[in-house]
């Protein structure tokens, strides 16, 4: 009676099977070398685990350290001012929150800004204060270093995303384009809400469900988008096409809204409402106020207006710089799955073009999207790749160093002089400062950290709709000499120090002589003076016998 064979793929019975088994049994008495093979499943799992460890401890950890080091260097090589908001809507507010003195601009009395972003730096200030380390230099540099670290994380996230979507070569060139972009270098360490919006946008894109992405997470990306909206409500413009695409492609639309978007939006908005309730003292939805003022009512025109095509003819080409031809080339080469990124760029430019007031920084968040196409272009260059890389690097290096170290540096350098007036002046108790420049030209108490009496020309907009409205700065520049004689009609009200641009000296020289002011310091500002802005900043000091009188008007 034949015993049944085990279930190993052979049929029971049959001569061939019996002979095969008999042959195997005979050979078992000799030395047989069996080849050991690991299962494909085991091999793939082990390979992925090793790759994951490499990404964490090998390539990516070194990449992160390199990027952090570069952005820290970036931070210290940007010593110029860009726009007033990098101080007046962040650091000045944070300083006022922690140290209870300073100045809040009209946007805060009108509740157009959220305290969420300044709270980040206020927390840093509070920790430094509790540790007794709140020196003026730390108050200036620690927030900027914090912003630099966040920008470094965003840079690495962009690299990781492109590595998932394409391959390491494409990711490398996108990363190169991102790091050598002069405008990114110029902005990414500044304490601007636009910078934070850009950082959050890049990290959110890492979790966004792009075709080919392995890091999709609706909760994470929607949380980051919601935070970007809380910090800068116009982030909704950039994210509208991306959110719409996700909604259209999601098969479980109701689940996406009820279990992802609504809970995330509710939690984030509630947190923002509570933060603003604490600091404003009343419930207010600043995001609605901001959009109503800047988008619906278009009050931003008070600070200047531009033609509708400005972003296409000037703004976008300038921030792209020498990346522009590579961006155009990459748009033709990139696969269809990147079409949504191009649509987002064009949509953002079109919507912002409808608003009269335009600035370069408003479209900064679309710049990383453009780097994807620039990197794709470099990947496919063969003959001209080395010259193209040299051209990109050197041209952007020049622009980055010039704008970061030279152009518009005087308004920061003069604050160092004011620090000396406060900390090194034996008569500091009687010192006072009057900044006679276009409003918000310089930082304020966040860069002095001393309750020194200071004043500047103010420029709040008229919200009542008056025609031919002139703010204090406008009235001053109509006739500076008459304004000074009228404002400081007696010696008791004169400040000890005047700060002004060089173009004003000749016009007010009679006042300076009659009031016994002497020029004591000169600071270079720009090679491109225009309008009310001069090439240099002058500091005048009034030196009289006896004690100074501090009855300066505020």
From Swiss-Prot:
Set out the biological process GO terms recorded for this chain's protein: GPI anchor biosynthetic process
Give the EC number(s) under which this enzyme is classified.
2.4.1.-
Q: Give the record's glycosylation annotations as residue positions.
A: 26, 427
The main place the protein resides is endoplasmic reticulum
Task: State the UniProt keywords alphabetically.
Answer: Endoplasmic reticulum, Epilepsy, Glycoprotein, Glycosyltransferase, GPI-anchor biosynthesis, Membrane, Transferase, Transmembrane, Transmembrane helix
- Consequence when changing residue 537 to M: In DEE80; uncertain significance
Identify the pathway: Glycolipid biosynthesis; glycosylphosphatidylinositol-anchor biosynthesis
Q: How does it sit in the membrane?
A: Multi-pass membrane protein
Q: Which Pfam families match?
A: Glyco_transf_22
Alphabetical GO CC annotations of the entry are: endoplasmic reticulum membrane; membrane
- Keyword Transport belongs to the record: no
Q: Which InterPro entries match?
A: GPI_mannosylTrfase (IPR005599)
What general EC class does the enzyme of this chain belong to?
Answer: transferase
Q: Which cysteines are joined by disulfide bonds?
A: none
Protein's cellular compartments = Endoplasmic reticulum membrane
Q: Where are the transmembrane segments?
A: 63-83, 136-156, 192-212, 224-244, 255-275, 315-335, 340-360, 362-382, 387-407
The outcome of changing residue 232 to H is: In DEE80; no effect on protein levels; decreased cell surface presence of GPI-anchored proteins
MF-aspect GO terms: alpha-1,2-mannosyltransferase activity; glycolipid mannosyltransferase activity
Q: What does this protein do?
A: Alpha-1,2-mannosyltransferase that catalyzes the transfer of the third mannose, via an alpha-1,2 bond, from a dolichol-phosphate-mannose (Dol-P-Man) to an alpha-D-Man-(1->6)-2-PEtn-alpha-D-Man-(1->4)-alpha-D-GlcN-(1->6)-(1-radyl,2-acyl-sn-glycero-3-phospho)-2-acyl-inositol intermediate to generate an alpha-D-Man-(1->2)-alpha-D-Man-(1->6)-2-PEtn-alpha-D-Man-(1->4)-alpha-D-GlcN-(1->6)-(1-radyl,2-acyl-sn-glycero-3-phospho)-2-acyl-inositol (also termed H6) and participates in the nineth step of the glycosylphosphatidylinositol-anchor biosynthesis.
Pathological condition linked to this protein in its record: Developmental and epileptic encephalopathy 80: A form of epileptic encephalopathy, a heterogeneous group of severe early-onset epilepsies characterized by refractory seizures, neurodevelopmental impairment, and poor prognosis. Development is normal prior to seizure onset, after which cognitive and motor delays become apparent. DEE80 is an autosomal recessive form characterized by onset of refractory seizures in the first year of life, severe global developmental delay and/or intellectual disability.
Q: Which family does it belong to?
A: Belongs to the glycosyltransferase 22 family. PIGB subfamily.
Q: What is this protein called?
A: GPI alpha-1,2-mannosyltransferase 3
């Amino acid at each position: 009676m034949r015993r049944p064979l085990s279930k190993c793929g052979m049929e029971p019975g049959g001569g061939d099977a019996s002979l095969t088994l008999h042959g195997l049994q005979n050979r078992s008495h000799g030395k047989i070398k069996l080849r050991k093979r690991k299962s494909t499943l085991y091999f793939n799992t082990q390979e992925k685990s090793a790759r994951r460890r490499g990404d964490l401890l090998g390539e990516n950890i070194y990449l992160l350290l390199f990027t952090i080091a570069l952005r820290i260097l970036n931070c210290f090589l940007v010593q110029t001012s860009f726009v007033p908001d990098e101080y007046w809507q962040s650091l000045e507010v944070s300083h006022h929150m922690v140290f209870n003195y300073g100045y809040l601009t009209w946007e805060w009395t009108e509740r157009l800004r959220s305290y969420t972003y300044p709270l980040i730096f206020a927390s840093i200030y509070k920790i430094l204060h509790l540790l007794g380390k709140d020196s003026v230099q730390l108050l200036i540099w620690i927030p900027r270093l914090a912003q630099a670290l966040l920008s470094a994380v965003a840079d690495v996230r962009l690299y990781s995303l492109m590595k998932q979507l394409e391959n390491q070569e494409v990711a490398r060139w996108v990363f190169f384009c991102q790091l050598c972009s002069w405008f990114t270098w110029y902005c990414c360490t500044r304490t601007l809400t636009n910078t934070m919006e850009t950082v959050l946008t890049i990290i959110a894109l890492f979790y966004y469900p792009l075709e080919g992405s392995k890091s999709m997470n609706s909760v994470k990306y929607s949380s980051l988008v919601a935070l970007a909206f809380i910090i800068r409500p116009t982030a909704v413009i950039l994210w509208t096409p991306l959110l719409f695409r996700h909604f259209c492609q999601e098969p479980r639309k109701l689940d996406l809204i009820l279990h992802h978007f609504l809970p995330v939006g509710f939690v984030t908005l509630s947190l923002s409402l509570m933060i603003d309730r604490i600091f404003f003292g009343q419930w207010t939805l600043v995001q609605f106020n901001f959009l109503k003022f800047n988008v619906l009512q278009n009050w931003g025109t008070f600070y200047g207006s531009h033609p509708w095509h400005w972003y296409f003819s000037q703004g976008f080409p300038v921030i792209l710089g020498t990346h522009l031809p590579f961006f155009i080339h990459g748009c033709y080469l990139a696969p269809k799955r990147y079409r949504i990124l191009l649509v987002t760029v064009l949509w953002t430019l079109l919507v912002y073009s409808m608003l009269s007031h335009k600035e370069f920084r408003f479209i900064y968040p679309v710049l990383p999207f453009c780097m994807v196409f620039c990197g794709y272009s470099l990947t496919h260059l063969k003959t001209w790749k080395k010259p193209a890389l040299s051209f990109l690097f050197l041209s952007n290096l020049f622009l980055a160093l010039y704008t970061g170290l030279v152009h518009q540096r005087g308004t920061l350098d003069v604050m160092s002089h004011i620090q000396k007036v406060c900390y090194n002046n034996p008569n500091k108790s009687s010192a006072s400062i009057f900044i006679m420049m276009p409003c918000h030209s310089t930082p304020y108490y966040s860069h002095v950290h001393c309750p020194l009496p200071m004043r500047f020309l103010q420029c709040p907009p008229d919200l009542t709709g008056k025609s031919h409205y002139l703010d204090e700065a406008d009235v001053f520049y109509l006739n500076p000499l008459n304004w000074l004689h009228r404002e400081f009609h007696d010696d008791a009200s004169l400040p000890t120090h005047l700060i002004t641009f060089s173009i004003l000296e000749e016009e007010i020289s009679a006042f300076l002589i009659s009031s016994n002011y002497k020029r004591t310091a000169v600071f270079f500002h720009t090679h491109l003076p225009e309008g009310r802005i001069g090439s240099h900043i002058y500091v005048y000091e009034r030196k009289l016998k006896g004690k100074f009188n501090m009855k300066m008007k505020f």
